[in-house]
Amino acid sequence: LRERGLAIAAKRSDRETSNGCVLVKKVNDFAAIIALKCETDFVANGADFIKLTSDILDAAIAAKAHTLDEVKALKVGESDAQAAVTQRSGITGEKMELDGYCVLEGDNIEVYDHMNKHTLCTMVQLNENNEEAGHKVAMQVAAMRPVALDESSVSEETKKTELEVAVAKTKEELVE
């Protein structure tokens, strides 16, 4: 049965994974966010899929993993995380992949899971301890989808494109 599941997963390797589960969690001074992708929202919203994502995130936080490769190698259940994902892929018949992982360490970290839907999560770290402000900033990050923290981290191409959009919008408003 396991070999059959691996064969199914291999056949689906060229398919697009446009849905999935994103989870974020903070334990003491360590926070992590992880994304496990799949093909359909039906699978993404399933309890087993969300539990697998949660189990992988729990293992990553317990090990204080810093990279996605470290996470993939962590023991989750009776196998490593990557094998657990492949096994779940064989069960559902959908392509699945661990797609993203990021951590923050230190004080003043706030995490946010938008409407507890497990599709849009953020984590932020402030210079000062202010839970309410941190929560509001994390919500704004989710709502506004910023491209950078400050101007120095924005590419020149993005600046040029944004300027062109702003100029075009201003011209349209002047014509009205």
Task: Spell out what each predicted region is.
Residues 1-176:
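N-terminal assembly/interaction segments in proteins that build large macromolecular machines
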